[in-house]
Amino acid sequence: MATQETDDSLISTDVQTDATERGDQPDETVVETKHLDVHYGDEQALDDVSIDIPENKVTALIGPSGCGKSTFLRCINRMNDQIDACRVDGKVVFKGKNVYDDDVDPVALRRKIGQVFQTPNPFPKSIRENVVYGLEVQGEPASDEDVERALRGAALWDEVNNQLDSSGLDLSGGQQQRLCIARAIAPDPEVILMDEPTSALDPVAASKIEDLIDELVEDYTVIIVTHNMQQAARISDKTAVFLTGGNLVEFDDTTNIFENPEDDRVEDYITGKFG
């Protein structure tokens, strides 16, 4: 289990985490949002979202298109900084530190909170260079052991270990997405954000990613946006339901969300009455 760090941990200090068995220990919060509002110009994308994300669990974010799921995800590692006219109010607290404080380095933050996107986006570089990018951007040397560790962690090593100098673009779509996961875990983050990571993949490749997520959560916290409610029910421990207007309407154990939701709107969404 990760130990508590001082407030300057997001600026320069590396953090080690120990794998924990899912469900064996009480939930520890790794990311907390407090009254989080997001606007794109005059349009509000998130409205007063407060939530505690548990460590070493899979948390799924579900809801209809345009409800703020991806916006919420991008707030956690400040990817919204790259969007013009985006204004973030409230707090996103990671290990006791508001990530929007002026002294937080977004690049250092993204080393600790990695991200995998909807469409596989390997760089037009070799498999090896894709993996080590996350380390080299921090000015750190990358060893062959680092490459192997990340590729094994992404369940890709056995498929590519004889072609590390080949282009990552030559891989299949599912392999490219696992390469992107390897790139995300190479810097040894604590949290991995996934924005619909299987939506562009065929069912077989998507199933491999789901199996991989189940393995990753032994060492990392995973927060995943998905439109596939069956996927959310299969792979997640917690589920947050967002609805139109950027409102978080319910957050609970996934079993409770899908079998006994408290909010009628959540039941209507899950049963397909709207969405």
Swiss-Prot record:
UniProt xrefs under CDD domains: ABC_PstB_phosphate_transporter
Top-level division of the source organism's lineage: Archaea
EC number: 7.3.2.1
Subcellular locations according to the entry: Cell membrane
GO biological process terms held by the UniProt record: phosphate ion transmembrane transport
Keyword Membrane recorded: yes
Family annotation (NCBIfam families): 3a0107s01c2
Quaternary structure and interacting proteins, as annotated: The complex is composed of two ATP-binding proteins (PstB), two transmembrane proteins (PstC and PstA) and a solute-binding protein (PstS).
Protein name: Phosphate import ATP-binding protein PstB 3
Organism: Natronomonas pharaonis (strain ATCC 35678 / DSM 2160 / CIP 103997 / JCM 8858 / NBRC 14720 / NCIMB 2260 / Gabara)
Gene from which the chain derives: pstB3
